[in-house]
Design a protein with these regions (language model features):
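A shared catalytic/ligand-binding motif for oxyanion handling
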Residues: 1-186
Length: 186
């Protein structure tokens, strides 16, 4: 990750290293930004960003694919967001889809387990910011001929007051990656 930080010319970073082929989170930023670490564990990095007009919380989240660990990871995310009073954005690999249109070439429906992503959007009245390129961010197999594709990675936000009208970003652009089953987000 140090090579990426240096190559992209960012001066600062917070990193949760990946384990095997799972996990891994990173926030990079340049000097001059006021960023304060709020929470840091294997499933999330949360930082408070102080702007000249307001503060907001950025959460980078890795929703583990392992069923036995999902409840704990999502519980930490929900607790963090419940304790925060103000605008926030959450970006990451949620390892859930919202509906059947977010997957291709695979069996539709049949999900009996709790969909924590749907609960997050509902409980916090969050907004999924959408996408501007290929909606699928994960593929089983090579990207060009993948048997299954899904939209597992996304950005969700809660805006309060005037921030919604002043700071609403454009849809997230997600370029395809040739070396990982996930696409980087920017």
């Amino acid at each position: 990750m140090e090579y990426v930080r240096s190559y992209l010319k960012f001066e600062n970073k917070l990193v949760v290293e990946f384990k095997g082929s799972a996990g891994g989170l990173c926030i990079l930023w340049k000097n001059g930004m006021s960023i304060k670490e709020v929470e840091f564990d294997k499933n999330l990095i949360a930082v408070k960003i102080v702007d000249s007009t307001f503060n907001w919380l950025l959460v980078c989240f890795y929703g583990t694919p392992y069923h036995s660990k999902k409840k704990k990871a999502w519980g930490s995310l929900f607790a963090l967001l419940e304790a925060h009073h103000g605008p926030w954005a959450c970006i990451g690999d949620f390892n859930f889809i919202i509906n059947d249109e977010e997957k291709s070439r695979s069996k539709k429906g049949g999900a009996l387990a709790t969909n924590f992503l749907k609960e997050l959007l509902f409980e916090f009245n969050a907004v999924d910011l959408g996408y501007s390129r290929d909606k699928f961010t994960w593929a089983k197999g090579k990207w060009g001929s993948a048997v299954i594709k899904r939209r597992m990675d996304r950005v969700s936000q809660v805006f309060l007051g005037d921030w919604l009208t002043q700071k609403l970003p454009s849809p997230i652009s997600i370029p395809l990656s040739q070396t990982t089953p996930h696409s980087p987000q920017h």
